[in-house]
């Protein structure tokens, strides 16, 4: 997903207006259109703004469906 420089640069079709030219009920429910709504103009609180990658957190679980117990837990470093 690419980030845009402002709300005026958002070009996700259907995000700007609905079929009647209004903005009511867009992105409702949130789960139905999370990708279309996730840009700098609107981002739900439960979705992270950024992700950090931790190397080797899944080194012991090559197949997460079978080896899910071996997935590592990542804790942030204390400051």
UniProtKB/Swiss-Prot annotation:
Its cofactor is cysteine tryptophylquinone residue. There is a cross-link at residues 27-33, 41-49 (3-cysteinyl-aspartic acid (Cys-Asp)). InterPro entries: QH-AmDH_gsu_dom (IPR015084), QH-AmDH_gsu_sf (IPR036487), QHNDH_gamma (IPR047830). Its main location: periplasm. The keyword Chaperone does not apply. Contains 1 cysteine tryptophylquinone per subunit. It holds the Pfam family QH-AmDH_gamma. There is a cross-link at residues 7-16 (4-cysteinyl-glutamic acid (Cys-Glu)). Inhibited by various carbonyl reagents, such as p-nitrophenylhydrazine (pNPH), 2,4-dinitrophenylhydrazine, semicarbazide and hydroxylamine. Keywords: CTQ, Electron transport, Oxidation, Oxidoreductase, Periplasm, Thioether bond, Transport. Optimum pH is around 8.0 for n-butylamine oxidation. Belongs to the quinohemoprotein amine dehydrogenase subunit gamma family. Catalyzes the oxidative deamination of a wide range of aliphatic monoamines and diamines. The physiological electron acceptor is an azurin-like blue protein. This is Quinohemoprotein amine dehydrogenase subunit gamma. It comes from Pseudomonas putida.
